[in-house]
Amino acid sequence: MCVPICSCENSLISNKFIDLQVNGHGGVDLQSANSIEQVQTVARSLAKHNVAAFLPTIITGSLEQMLKQVTLLNSAAKKQSSDEAKILGIHLEGPFISKTKRGVHPEKWIIDANLEIAKQFVSLGNIRLVTIAPETTGANEVIKFLVKNDVIVSIGHTNCSYEQAMVAFDAGAKSVTHLFNAMPKDLDSGIMRAIQESKQVYVQIIIDSIHCTIEQMKFAIENFADRLIVTNDPITAAGLGDGEFPFGEMKLIVKDEIARRQDGTLAGGVATMESSVKILKSIGANDELIKDLTYSRALELLKTTL
């Protein structure tokens, strides 16, 4: 497809963003936050970087801990003020994911898709998006249940085949979590072929020149521009510089704007949506496309407005 090209380096862009994957911000980790005030710190920190709304994201942990964090986030969502980025719902990134593509998710808490556990999460309310690996046992049943209950299913942290991805999309999965990360990167791989063929599926991507190469970002824009969504996948350290920061049960080391576990595994992002916009402009995206990728498209996926 034809991609709009930015004709003016300093042309105006939308100064409001939506982020569908926020693990933490402003020094607070949402995996271990234990007060509404801490969640508010995240929301205020995001707002300072022009994020209008977001999905607080809980990664794989013990069932008890994940349920506790969902309850806390729901309480915080009911007590928001005008200086906070709005909570649009909760993103569960796990625990039904692939152990081989787990990234920094703790392996001991990763489980096959489980309908009864999915029901526990949904019963708490406000679950808007769930990342799942379609190759896990029971995934198809859980996907259908989530879709029936108006939860968006996103394929991610997966090593699935083409056939498994297509079965998931046919069951109602309508998104992909952080393209090129925690999945096979080869364009001829099963999941990549399935994504390219499934025009109804939205594609989320981290734009920070760390999680994806310039070539991968250009490929995504050239092939998925009308269904692409930019996320930052920010962690506790976002915007705070180098250092050690908590992330669930582990510590992450940030050096030169790259967050890694102690064993070197790449973790979430530390960039901002403003920096993502600069990268998008540098590779030729125009203002209209940038607004779509960083704001409008996310609302379209969520079927909501601000």
For each predicted feature, which ranges?
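Active-site-adjacent C-terminal substructures of enzyme catalytic domains
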Residues: 142, 164-289, 302-305
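Divalent metal-dependent hydrolysis catalytic cores, especially in the metallo-beta-lactamase
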Residues: 22-29, 40-69, 85-98, 125-135, ...
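Generic structural signal for well-ordered alpha-helices
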Residues: 42-43, 67-74, 118, 143, ...
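Divalent metal-binding pocket/active-site signature
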Residues: 92, 99-190
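Conserved, mostly hydrophobic/aromatic
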Residues: 21, 46, 92, 146, ...
